[in-house]
Amino acid sequence: MKKDLTNSRLDRQNILNNEMAIEEIQNKSGVEGIVWNNKLFVTREMTAKFFDVDVRTISRYLEQNGEELSENGYEVLRGKNLKSFLDAARNSGKDINVPTKTTVLGVFDFRAFLNMAMLLSESEKARALRQLMLDIVIDLINRKTGGGTKYINQRDKDFLFSSLQ
C-alpha cells in the first residue's frame, strides 16, 4: 500500500499536531468560514462545496472516521452553542443555509477541516490542499533547521557503518 496522507493516520496526526503549520496553512489556503470562539469553523455543506463533493460523501467519511475527526475538532452543536454559532454566522454575513428549526449542526474547526482534506480521495481540491500542507510543513522544517535537511542514504546498507568510521 502506498504511504500517503489518505491512508496513514499517524502522518495525518503529525501534521495536525503542528500548530505553526496549521496557522500557516490557514493563512495560505484561503478557506473561508465562520469565526466563532476565536476559531474558524465550516459546516458539512460548506466543506462539501469547497471540495466539490456531495454532502453524502462528507457524511460517509464522518461515519467511517468519526473518532479521528472528533479528536481533531469536528463537533455537533446543540442548544446554546448552536444558537451562538448561528448568531456568529448571521453577524459575519455568511449564508450557511441552515433552517431556522435546526436543533443540531455538525461543524468542522479548521484542524478537522484539514483532517477531512487528508481523508478525501475523491476530490481534486483535497489533493491540492494536501500538497499545500506538505509544502508548508517541509518549508517550516527547513526554516527551523536553518535551510536544509540531511537524509541518510538508505540504499547503501553500509552507509551508517562507514559514516561512523
Q: Could you tell me what each predicted segment is?
A:
Residues E67-G73, A126-R127:
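Cytochrome P450 catalytic domain signature, combining two hallmark sequence patches
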